[in-house]
Amino acid sequence: MNQIPLLQTKDLKKHFLLERRTMFGPRDRVYAVDGINIDLNLGEILGLVGESGCGKSTLGRTILRLIEPTAGTIHFNGQDITHVKRAELKKLRSKMQIVFQDPYSSLNPRLTVLHIVGDALKAQGIAQGSEIADRVADMLNKVGIHKEKLRAFPHEFSGGQRQRIGIARALILQPKLIICDEPVSALDVSIQAQVINLLADLKTEFHLSYIMIAHDLSVVNHVSNRIAVMYLGKIIELATNRALLANPLHPYTQALISAIPVLDPDKKKKRIILKGEPPSPTNPPGGCPFHPRCWRAMGICKTDVPQWVEIEPNHYTMCYLYE
């Protein structure tokens, strides 16, 4: 019997309309998320990587209905949540949470840690009064913040500590899914591994599922079960972390992996330098979205969008090199 995915999206799209350049001219459209199909199983960590601006964060927010999808469907725990109303969406918030990228702007500077972490308990009618303080103190302890800091304000903490508070806020409702939106990119390198290891430990303790968003493949490699590579609003490759690192299929994935530093000086590898910048999401190229920068592009790549194909068991890509 096949397991029902905890999360499943089908042809999910999020397009943004921009202001008109002239009074009667057409409105440009940003194709931020452009036909995403993913599934996430209970207890799984899915890494989502790609360059800045490729649509990773928009995808995460669309899945959580923090922004409304343009088209496609979102199923969570077997339920279609694409168009559920506000009251039902509020209930779902307890099962789907997010850890934001910037620990400095994501915490309200006017609120104490008690309110930042605990207000969701009150809003969901889960706890009141002293019970909220007890639950928050316990959760802070699990993320490495002493309970004496309950009445402290965000400015009294370091960046790494603030992100731990953000993690506690996401965990306090005991969700099933947490979307980690570049959770360490704003932190010092010396702190990044600590936060990633904390998230891995909490995943085991609370039986969580993560979508781990990052622009750096090395950040998600060691904790993810599978990795999806995103480019210009589309997922262009998906595989287990081991398969992706050992045998990257798409030229863009090959370029990303070539940029990962090798610690062993005897193991040399050729760095693939991509030419130019990614095309504008307001005017994506025809055919394969990567063809303007691809050193292996063929004529068909410029005119036809490649299909999503399974090259090896559970290893998918969209590239004409494999059709």
Where do the protein language model's features map onto the residues?
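Short catalytic/signature loops enriched in Gly
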Residues: 3-5, 18-24, 29, 238-323
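Conserved ABC transporter NBD signature motif
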Residues: 72-80
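Helix-to-loop junction immediately C-terminal to a conserved catalytic motif
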Residues: 64
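A short, proline-enriched helix->beta-strand linker immediately N-terminal to the Walker B motif
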Residues: 172-176
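Conserved ABC ATPase "signature" region
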Residues: 80, 131-148, 201, 254-258
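Conserved ABC ATPase signature
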Residues: 153-157, 161
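P-loop NTP-binding/switch modules centered on Walker-like glycine-rich loops
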Residues: 179, 183-187, 191-269
